[in-house]
Amino acid sequence: MSGSHSNDEDDVVQVPETSSPTKVASSSPLKPTSPTVPDASVASLRSRFTFKPSDPSEGAHTSKPLPSGSPEVALVNLAREFPDFSQTLVQAVFKSNSFNLQSARERLTRLRQQRQNWTWNKNASPKKSETPPPVKKSLPLANTGRLSSIHGNINNKSSKITVAKQKTSIFDRYSNVINQKQYTFELPTNLNIDSEALSKLPVNYNKKRRLVRADQHPIGKSYESSATQLGSAREKLLANRKYGRHANDNDEEEEESMMTDDDDASGDDYTESTPQINLDEQVLQFINDSDIVDLSDLSDTTMHKAQLIASHRPYSSLNAFVNTNFNDKDTEENASNKRKRRAAASANESERLLDKITQSIRGYNAIESVIKKCSSYGDLVTSQMKKWGVQVEGDNSELDLMNLGEDDDDDNDDGNNDNNNSNNNNTAGADATSKEKEDTKAVVEGFDETSAEPTPAPAPAPVERETKRIRNTTKPKVVEDEDDDVDLEAIDDELPQSEHEDDDYEEEDEDYNDEEEDVEYDDGDDDDDDDDEFVATRKNTHVISTTSRNGRKPIVKFFKGKPRLLSPEISLKDYQQTGINWLNLLYQNKMSCILADDMGLGKTCQVISFFAYLKQINEPGPHLVVVPSSTLENWLREFQKFAPALKIEPYYGSLQEREELRDILERNAGKYDVIVTTYNLAAGNKYDVSFLKNRNFNVVVYDEGHMLKNSTSERFAKLMKIRANFRLLLTGTPLQNNLKELMSLLEFIMPNLFISKKESFDAIFKQRAKTTDDNKNHNPLLAQEAITRAKTMMKPFILRRRKDQVLKHLPPKHTHIQYCELNAIQKKIYDKEIQIVLEHKRMIKDGELPKDAKEKSKLQSSSSKNLIMALRKASLHPLLFRNIYNDKIITKMSDAILDEPAYAENGNKEYIKEDMSYMTDFELHKLCCNFPNTLSKYQLHNDEWMQSGKIDALKKLLKTIIVDKQEKVLIFSLFTQVLDILEMVLSTLDYKFLRLDGSTQVNDRQLLIDKFYEDKDIPIFILSTKAGGFGINLVCANNVIIFDQSFNPHDDRQAADRAHRVGQTKEVNITTLITKDSIEEKIHQLAKNKLALDSYISEDKKSQDVLESKVSDMLEDIIYDENSKPKGTKE
């Protein structure tokens, strides 16, 4: 990796790209798309076409005559011939000339000549001979006549550190198939292999190309000729195996029709256990007895209408309710001439209200029945946990198991009392019988970790026993031979540290979203049944039995120690050891679960340990891990570092690369343990989804599991199509008091129970989502009861440990609020924006609209969200407004820029002036820096970027942290334009820094993190809250500055946890900058009260927008109330 590099080096990428003004990623309303950016067809080949002069391998291809049909070599040749042009420009010209080498060369030659002429005659009139030739496509920067993107580095003295661009792809660096010799690991040598028995087993064909029904499977047919008991048993197993299907889009209709009976059966079986309820009586009782707010909510009507309904109580029957007129007297008097129409409407309205109430109650009944069914499965887990000495009962809705293994070593318990308060409540009571205590101790097994011998692996069963086991697949038995018995938990597990938490967001990145591929399979209902039959027999032949010979469930024992497949240097924390045992318990019971440990406690560590444990006990893969883009490479590194014996394959790359990857991974099926991919690909186009769907994964892990907390989202539907025997959701967020989220999590755990109830659930959630009255945040009694029941029932399936419980492993965290003053310029701007807010609120409240059509439209289109955003920007920095560059200046600028070659021919002064009018002072300054020959005199020359109350406070903080304490610091901001300003501030202060935001290439993000760890001379890392606020590990810094806070405090907490997590050795200080007497104080107060968080679902952008709009409305009301009275007093 390199340090600072000159800006003209083509083989160095500036990170992130948005730090260059070529990409406008800001809150400015001006967001033009530069025509220089290649379309999808070129973008998909970008990594192959990109000119890399430092790569000697490319030189060999450019010295020979260009072969026909080789645009890659042609593009490299052009780049070498014209090194004074950027790669982007060469690509754009090559494309605009239809990939014709000769035409592109001629065009670039003319551009070079034009640039030379302009350089020597920069003061000449643009109308002279140096004017570009009249080829409209030749000026991609200005062929619209408007101002395009802001280009170039605005600060030649920038102290930002850049890193060399990655030369290889993620797959090349981490693929086990590509790098088979990179890691060697000694597997257990004491395997007892019976070659004669193995020779009798059928050959397993791995190649999977199309859907073949079980009764048509060629493997199955091959057994018919064998006429052996094993062949017959195998054929029966294939016929009943649901997880072994390989869907093809040509066969989906057939599969859907064949699955219909299974779906119906599942629903019928489930309904049989649900007690019949007289729905009409329940609805009538609700109408007569319910609270007004509940009545309004379930009938999907206004509070006023609900009061009218209540005024006619009691109703003798539902028929009497339908025949009641719910119009008030004023409405009747004002519409006496329309009585007939109103009577019909009234009747229709009564029926509509009744239908809504009926649908809602039916939905809540469905929820209640599902909760009851889930409870029975929860009891199975609870009963086995009691064998460990754990009592699950209690008010807490989540498990917080800590150090269960230590409960059995009385002499080791004394030192852990402080961190085992929850354990003390969970252990068996003092009145337990001696037999119960013996049973509790009997389920804990350990082994000698100092032994050099590998953990013994189970010997293969004789063919006769294998045949018998397969014949009884529907009721699996434990193989209990004295020589072959394997204690399920007697082997062990462990893993590293580093988790990748919730980020409430999958940031907007370049995760290879190929728009032309966004056509999805219409998979029908078969996926619901295929995916989720968690009680079905596992596809692999090593399935661990859940029933012993005497018909009783075997005890899943608590094991101590780490797996032998983990690196010898790794040791597990006690709570992590407990977490792996809990995962194993749920896995053996074939029930999915949620690991919700607090952010920074090493969920990644526990997952990799669990995979190592599964391989050690011969539970085969492949497994799948779905992660946010920012954490992809970190996951791959963690696998390499902590479990080198596991064979990991990343599924990530461009469109063409992924096509090659699919072929490679299909050809090497069975040669890898885990596939790691991103959410954008797992829920992407049909090819990616189909490939992953047909891998027949054993375990699927969803990192940042909050993305699955909305069962009605498109992403949830796509991800649930990925088949798996066991699903694990990782999240650092606690359960919210939100019924929709709880039911989504339940569907994730036990999806087959939801098939017949899906419509009833959707009716409730859709109704709740569109409620617009003041009671929209109210949970009806039925909903609150369901929430309480659901949270209690889900307790066995959700494990959450908080940092305060494992504080002995983490240094303390200190949070501070640093108040900042508005400077004079900020105060003037802020007061002006306040008046706009007040006027907007007053006019809407009084129903006054301007007579001028333009002003009226402006008022109606404005929203509280936009107005509050303006106040937030004023609290941050005055350069986020156009205050310095007045109309007179931008008129001169729009005229001067026409002398630039990019705008001389097609530039339109009026269009350019209009574009400039929407830009902020900082954006206009960047534009001037970008065109120094014509606009340099308009640049800001007085360090205006240093003039802000927050910048003053930041300077003092940085001096204390960097100069006085010699420590590192992370600075987070929600806005990329603020990060641009911070770049100039830090460069002015001469602090070296790195930057990461949503536009930073995924392939380069880990390089930045590595650079920050390795280079002690780089004290600052600036990050966007959304892109850098989750998943990554930055414990080398122990100071965090939140430059601007989010509406949701969870976002800021995640950002802070980049430093306060497992691996941190110093005390962590988190400082939030808040401008006094500004909107930021109000936001902070709302955040402290955690308002609106229950409805927050970060994956669902619509829900996020609703949250921000709601908070903005509240803030506008607060501002209006605080300022209207003083204003009236003055008058």
From Swiss-Prot:
Q: Which UniProt keywords apply?
A: ATP-binding, Chromatin regulator, Chromosome, DNA damage, DNA repair, DNA-binding, Helicase, Hydrolase, Nucleotide-binding, Nucleus, Phosphoprotein
Molecular function (GO) terms for this protein are:
ATP binding; ATP hydrolysis activity; ATP-dependent chromatin remodeler activity; chromatin binding; DNA binding; helicase activity; identical protein binding; nucleosome array spacer activity
* Localization terms from the record: Nucleus; Chromosome
Official protein name in the record? ATP-dependent helicase FUN30
What GO biological process terms does the UniProt entry carry, in alphabetical order? Answer: chromatin remodeling; DNA double-strand break processing; double-strand break repair involved in meiotic recombination; heterochromatin formation; meiotic DNA double-strand break processing; negative regulation of transcription by RNA polymerase II; positive regulation of RNA splicing; positive regulation of transcription by RNA polymerase II
Q: What does this protein do?
A: DNA helicase that possesses intrinsic ATP-dependent nucleosome-remodeling activity and is both required for DNA repair and heterochromatin organization. Promotes DNA end resection of double-strand breaks (DSBs) following DNA damage: probably acts by weakening histone DNA interactions in nucleosomes flanking DSBs, facilitating single-stranded DNA (ssDNA) production by the EXO1 and SGS1 machinery. Promotes gene silencing at heterochromatin by regulating the chromatin structure within or around silent loci. Also required for heterochromatin organization at centromeres.
- What ranges does the record list as Acidic residues composition bias? 250-271, 405-416, 480-533
Give the Basic and acidic residues compositional bias ranges: 433-442
What the record says about disrupting the gene is: Impaired ability to repair double-strand breaks (DSBs).
Q: How does it assemble?
A: Homodimer.
